[in-house]
């Protein structure tokens, strides 16, 4: 039971962290990148 709860909480935290990093990148404004991550992503895509 405890291991299952731990697994679920780990899964949820991974989803939250991924969402936190992916969402700003998806809506990046390459003309004026708000974050360093955006700037790097914009450079990769040309």
Curated annotation (Swiss-Prot):
Alphabetized UniProt keyword annotations: Amidation, Calcium-activated potassium channel impairing toxin, Disulfide bond, Ion channel impairing toxin, Neurotoxin, Potassium channel impairing toxin, Secreted, Signal, Toxin
Histidine amide: residues carrying this PTM: 45
Region (Essential for toxin activity), start-end ranges: 40-41
Tissue: Expressed by the venom gland.
Pfam families: Bee_toxin
GO CC annotations, alphabetized: extracellular region
Disulfide bonds: 28-38, 30-42
GO molecular function annotation: potassium channel regulator activity; toxin activity
Domain of life of the source: Eukaryota
Name of protein: Apamin
